[in-house]
From Swiss-Prot:
Native species: Thermus thermophilus (strain ATCC 27634 / DSM 579 / HB8)
Top EC class, one word: lyase
Catalytic reactions of this protein: (S)-4-hydroxy-2-oxopentanoate = acetaldehyde + pyruvate; (S)-4-hydroxy-2-oxohexanoate = propanal + pyruvate
One BP term from GO: catabolic process
Residues the record lists as binding Mn(2+): D20, H201, H203
Functional description taken from the UniProt entry: Catalyzes the retro-aldol cleavage of both 4-hydroxy-2-oxopentanoate (HOPA) and 4-hydroxy-2-oxohexanoate (HOHA) to pyruvate and acetaldehyde or propanaldehyde, respectively. The aldehydes produced by this reaction are directly channeled to the dehydrogenase TTHB247, ensuring that these toxic aldehydes are sequestered from cellular components. Is involved in the meta-cleavage pathway for the degradation of aromatic compounds. Appears to be stereospecific since it can cleave (4S)-4-hydroxy-2-oxopentanoate but not the (4R) isomer.
Signal peptide span: none
Assembly: Homodimer. Can also form a heterotetramer composed of two aldolase (TTHB246) and two dehydrogenase (TTHB247) subunits. Upon complex formation, the aldolase shows a 5-fold increase in substrate affinity, while the dehydrogenase shows a 3-fold decrease; the kcat values of each enzyme are reduced by 2-fold when they are in a complex.
UniProt name for this protein: 4-hydroxy-2-oxovalerate aldolase
Length: 347
């Protein structure tokens, strides 16, 4: 399926290698790695660099995974490194609080991206209020946007706009969307919002991160996300260096240096990667079943420990419509599957 990009405009590009990529990196970034990545991104012309635990400010915990380096140290290091790019952080209400947001502002963030489930925009009101009170650029994330129709998401986006969001994102957290899904959802937000810009955040579980991003741009998306080498949860995100090349070929380059990004992906990010995310057996299952992308490594680890196929765990989580914050379901489902298997063998 082709999309008409004739009315699309060069997007604002946000890199989230140091946030979404933290999932793939098991939250083990060092200050030195953060500085090297930030410098390369800054020199290549990205608008903003998102830095925090993969699950946002305050996410370092037993449930979500402990950070090797305090996220405030990483934020401070990135802010000291960049010359042009803004520094952003993610915040999930219920995980991050005013305390973490205030500390992040003191460490140097200029933007906060406030993420809720796509059905729960109403819980973000006070967080947008705090962001504006602290002088931050405020962005809303409607996570797991594949789970609801465009018109429903438009209503949720209007709530965030009313709370003060400067941008509201359609977020394909499960990498479950087809291009027409991305197009329809972005289009609905563009028609519904009077002031706020519209963004799109892709995951590559079905191999469609770049394609869906182009569909979003065809629908009028103003902002898009990417990561170096696609380093992120599940099968990763839209690879920034690939996106830059595609945007340049389409006449939509917002000022990114394609060759600096290619070098950054190869020579800066390459040696840092724990592994190269791609649509493997379990990642495709996440996109197919519509499961939150960050569940992938947890399911692989628990499956290995208990001798349960991660694919079975992920498919069952999809059937139960598990969402972010329900990581404890992974162990529960795995134990239930193991018990069921043992019962079948006993019979």
């Amino acid at each position: 399926m082709s999309w008409d990009l004739s009315t699309a405009k060069p997007p604002v590009v946000v890199d989230t290698t140091l946030r979404d990529g933290s999932h793939a990196h098991r939250h083990q970034y060092t200050v030195e790695e953060a500085r090297a990545i930030a410098q390369a991104l800054d020199e290549a012309g990205v608008y903003a660099i998102e830095v925090s635990h993969g699950d946002g400010l305050g996410g370092s915990s037993l449930q979500y995974g402990f950070s090797r380096t305090d996220e405030m140290e990483l934020i401070r290091a990135v802010r000291e490194t960049v010359r042009r790019a803004k520094v952003a952080a993610l915040l999930l209400p219920g995980i991050g609080t005013r305390k973490e947001l205030k500390e992040a502002v003191e460490a140097g963030i200029q933007m906060v991206r406030i993420a809720t489930q796509c059905t729960e925009a109403d819980i973000s009101e006070q967080h947008f209020g705090m962001a504006k009170e602290m002088g931050l650029e405020a962005v809303g994330f409607l996570m797991m946007s594949h789970m609801r129709p465009p018109e429903f998401l438009a209503e949720q986006a209007r709530l965030m706009e009313g709370y003060g969001a400067d941008v509201v994102y359609i977020v394909d957290s499960a990498g479950a969307m087809l291009p027409e899904d991305a197009y329809a959802r972005v289009k609905a937000l563009k028609e519904a919002l009077s002031r706020a810009k519209v963004g799109f955040h892709a995951h590559n579980n079905l191999g469609l991160a770049i394609g869906n991003t182009l569909a979003a741009l065809a629908a009028g998306a103003d902002w898009v996300d990417a990561t170096l080498r696609g380093y992120g949860a599940g099968a990763g995100n839209a690879p920034l260096e690939v996106l830059a090349a595609v945007l340049d070929k389409a006449g939509l380059n917002p000022g990114l240096d394609v060759f600096k990004l290619l070098d950054a992906a190869e020579y800066v990010m390459g040696p840092i990667l724990h592994f190269q995310p791609y649509p493997d057996r379990d990642s495709v299952a996440i996109g197919y079943a519509g499961v939150y992308s960050t569940f992938l490594l947890h399911a692989k680890r628990i499956g290995k420990e208990l001798g349960v196929d991660p694919l079975a765990i992920l498919l069952e989580l999809g059937r139960r419509q598990a969402v972010a914050g329900q990581e404890d379901w992974i162990l529960r489902v795995a134990l239930e599957l193991k018990e069921k298997e043992a019962g079948a063998l006993a019979d």
